Curated annotation (Swiss-Prot):
The lineage of its organism: Bacteria, Pseudomonadati, Pseudomonadota, Gammaproteobacteria, Lysobacterales. The keyword Membrane applies. It comes from the Bacteria. Belongs to the ATPase gamma chain family. It is found in: Cell inner membrane. It comes from Xanthomonas axonopodis pv. citri (strain 306). The gene is atpG. Disulfide bonds: none annotated. Produces ATP from ADP in the presence of a proton gradient across the membrane. The gamma chain is believed to be important in regulating ATPase activity and the flow of protons through the CF(0) complex. GO terms for cellular component: plasma membrane; proton-transporting ATP synthase complex. One of its GO terms (molecular function) is ATP binding. HAMAP family: ATP_synth_gamma_bact. Its main location: membrane. This is ATP synthase gamma chain.
């Protein structure tokens, strides 16, 4: 059994760790509310853009935007992967990466090449380690990311798709369901799925200046950017939720460990006192 001094040192160490985990839990609990507000605020914009594109696509029947055309043969697949910059978020990032590798494997079995654009330090480090072809990366977006920070890496994939270098693009991120649940999501970004640009038929019509095709050309890129931005906000909220839960679990485990160590310390102290009493009694009997 370890000595009393050694056990007290361990207790002190665990108590210090508990202070850190509690602080991180409280910080994440505070940040998650703001992250949820930003996430909910941006949703109506993406939904409105989706409706606009649906109307434009149906209004311009003689023009089909490249983003809406499904390609017969897929030779190269692009992924925009969103992760956190920091760790201590449980299995949030690793679960996403593991599922993505499972999604990639069938494409590789068909002979398709894989290109990846990463958003977040954890994704960048992971895909460098597994030697996947990274064509773009952005990190350190902070807790309040701006769409301007993402335009560069989004453009990399958009240009590759337009030029025919990539035949399909997926968006990979953690969707925020609630504080306890974050779901790894794989959304097809390009070409846009048919359901994305179909709207219910209405009797009214719109006038577009100069024409529907020109407006669609301009709006389409903004829509793709809004989808990626929304996914980043979802991932930020997921990160804070996962970290809050992970740090609470760590604090609870620290409490249990402190209780166990305290019990061991009390037993060791009791054994030492008992031994001292026995030695005193034995010494007195010898005299």
């Amino acid at each position: 059994m370890a000595g009393g001094r050694e056990i007290k040192t361990k207790i002190k160490s665990v108590q210090n760790t508990r202070k850190v985990t509690r602080a991180l839990e409280m910080v994440s609990a505070s940040k998650i509310r703001k992250a949820q507000e930003r996430m909910k605020t941006s949703r109506p914009y993406a939904q409105a853009m989706k409706q606009v594109i649906g109307h434009l696509a149906q209004a311009s029947t003689d023009f089909q935007h490249p983003f809406l055309i499904e390609r017969e043969q897929v030779k190269r697949v692009g992924y925009i992967v969103i992760s956190s910059d920091r760790g201590l978020a449980g299995g949030l990032n690793n679960n996403l990466f593991r599922k993505m590798l499972g999604e990639v494997r069938p494409w590789q079995d068909k002979g398709a090449e894989i290109d990846v654009v990463t958003i977040g330090q954890k994704a960048s480090a992971f895909f460098r380690r597994v030697k996947v072809n990274m064509v773009g990366s952005v990190t350190h977006l902070g807790d309040s990311p701006q769409v301007e920070q993402l335009i560069g890496v989004i453009k990399v994939m958009i240009d590759a798709f337009i030029e025919g270098k990539v035949d399909r693009v997926y968006l990979v991120y953690n969707r925020f369901v609630n504080t306890m649940t974050q779901k790894a999501s794989f959304d097809q970004l390009l070409p846009l799925p048919a359901a994305e640009h179909k709207v219910a038929h209405h009797d009214w019509d719109y006038l577009y200046e100069p024409d529907a095709a020109s407006v669609l050309e301009h709006v389409m890129t903004r829509y793709i950017e809004s989808l990626v931005y929304q996914a980043v906000l979802e991932n930020v909220a997921s990160e804070h939720a996962a970290r809050m839960v992970a740090m609470k679990a760590a604090s609870d485990n620290a409490n249990k460990m402190i209780g166990t160590l305290q019990l061991v310390y009390n037993k060791a102290r009791q054994a030492a006192i008992t031994q001292e009493i026995s030695e005193i009694v034995s010494g007195a009997a010898a005299v």
